[in-house]
Amino acid sequence: MTIQKNWQELIRPNKLQVTPGSDPSRFATLVAEPLERGFGQTLGNALRRVLLSSLQGAAVQSVHIDGVLHEFSSIAGVREDVTDIVLNIKDISIKMQGEGPKRMVIKKQGPGVVTAGDIQTVGDVVVLNPELQLCTLDDGAEIRMEFTVDTGKGYVAADRNRPEDAPIGLIPVDSLFSPVRKVSYKVENTREGQILDYDKLTLTIETNGAITPEDALAYSARILQDQLNVFVNFEEPRKEVVQEIIPDLAFNPAFLKKVDELELSVRSANCLKNDNIVYIGDLVQKSEAEMLRTPNFGRKSLNEIKEVLAQMGLHLGMEVPGWPPENIDELAKRFEDHY
């Protein structure tokens, strides 16, 4: 037995379906199927942990407010105390292209609400939630705040954001660098051909807009791939590539696909099997009337088969010159990557 059989004979997902949410830059549902039994839970849990903890992002690390010495202060003419303002600052979502740290400033006079959209940013820093309210100024009040922004991963507590040489009045802020806000997953049964006990993994991802859910998942998978490489203690033998000569066919290569590979109901599949219909080429030559004469084959099964064939650009009652070929089994193997 070759070692490659350990992974080559496992079924792998043949598609990743992405369904965008109301805001495609922030919300999406991603479905991978089919997976070997148990792999849905294994991959779902691992990807969720990496998505929430390991992706790079940007966040506010500290703030300096003019006239404020510490976070337990209050500011004349500002309705919120400094503690509440700092809590609001934690929720600022930022996208930063270059390397940090960077400085951002707010300077505003009352009356009115101070929002994240009032921040004066540098060129490669973007505030993603400008509607976020930071504080409220009364008539005649004024506030000036200077933020330090940097990149990182995961969650960093405020005490770790305080430099050793921090000046008086610098207030460190808890930093949530991760661009991913929420991740949930579920595992369901799915079918492949006539086998019903494969896994379907569904991931629902919400980001802050700095990265799309699809890219976040791709980066997380790459992180896992990189971390697992250390456990592979062998090199695979290189397979010599031989250029195969593919013969010309007088018919569509899709006709060489077996009907048991179609996603049909058990009833429809059994009816085809009992009527000795093995390949799609056998099936498309049948008329609707011939199919309805098959024992236990009704209108519901007929409509199901017509729908599956239509998705392939085929239909019942087709003429297939040269069918069946003498070497049909050999041709089916040679053309399995062409339909």
Curated annotation (Swiss-Prot):
What reaction does this enzyme carry out catalytically?
RNA(n) + a ribonucleoside 5'-triphosphate = RNA(n+1) + diphosphate
Sorted alphabetically, which keywords does the UniProt record give?
A: DNA-directed RNA polymerase, Nucleotidyltransferase, Transcription, Transferase
List, in alphabetical order, the Gene Ontology terms for molecular function in this entry.
DNA binding; DNA-directed RNA polymerase activity; protein dimerization activity
Keyword Transcription (UniProt): yes
Q: Which Pfam families match?
A: RNA_pol_A_bac, RNA_pol_A_CTD, RNA_pol_L
Which SMART domains did the record assign? Answer: RPOLD
Root EC class: transferase
Q: Which family does the entry's similarity section mention? A: Belongs to the RNA polymerase alpha chain family.
Function of the protein: DNA-dependent RNA polymerase catalyzes the transcription of DNA into RNA using the four ribonucleoside triphosphates as substrates.
Q: What is this protein called?
A: DNA-directed RNA polymerase subunit alpha
From which source organism is this entry? Afipia carboxidovorans (strain ATCC 49405 / DSM 1227 / KCTC 32145 / OM5)
Instruction: Give me the gene this protein comes from.
Output: rpoA
